[in-house]
């Protein structure tokens, strides 16, 4: 049984979160949680929360056994970017893009 958890509009760029997502794709959830716990990146905390939510969803909604679960799919899509302005010299301004991402984790017992 596949169970999904999502975090939309996560305040980190998709490029940075994908680096962390690649670390846990296909692993058992216990091993994936361990990897994320000791990964020293902000994105690891975001992905860990989504993975824990997917595990809780599988246990509560589908009655799955946690020991059998593995990360079947994990993907990160780009979310909307917030546009901000950084004032510069001589009346000019630069545009800053504060990027967001949509993190999706699918856990499965197969």
From Swiss-Prot:
Instruction: Tell me which species this is from.
Output: Pectobacterium atrosepticum (strain SCRI 1043 / ATCC BAA-672) (Erwinia carotovora subsp. atroseptica)
Q: Which Pfam families match?
A: Ribosomal_L22 (PF00237)
Q: Which UniProt keywords apply?
A: Ribonucleoprotein, Ribosomal protein, RNA-binding, rRNA-binding
- The reply to whether RNA-binding figures as a keyword in the UniProt entry is yes
* Stored InterPro entries: Ribosomal_uL22, Ribosomal_uL22_bac/chlpt-type, Ribosomal_uL22_bac/org-type, Ribosomal_uL22_CS, Ribosomal_uL22_sf
Per the entry, what this protein does is: This protein binds specifically to 23S rRNA; its binding is stimulated by other ribosomal proteins, e.g. L4, L17, and L20. It is important during the early stages of 50S assembly. It makes multiple contacts with different domains of the 23S rRNA in the assembled 50S subunit and ribosome. The globular domain of the protein is located near the polypeptide exit tunnel on the outside of the subunit, while an extended beta-hairpin is found that lines the wall of the exit tunnel in the center of the 70S ribosome.
Give the family this protein belongs to, as stated in its UniProt record.
Belongs to the universal ribosomal protein uL22 family.
Name this protein carries in UniProt: Large ribosomal subunit protein uL22
Q: How does it assemble?
A: Part of the 50S ribosomal subunit.
Asked if the keyword Ribonucleoprotein belongs to this entry, the reply reads yes
The GO terms this record gives for MF are: rRNA binding; structural constituent of ribosome
Q: Which PROSITE patterns does this chain map to?
A: RIBOSOMAL_L22 (PS00464)
Superkingdom of the source species: Bacteria
Classification lineage:
Bacteria, Pseudomonadati, Pseudomonadota, Gammaproteobacteria, Enterobacterales
Q: Name one GO cellular component term.
A: cytosolic large ribosomal subunit
* Gene Ontology annotations of biological process type: translation
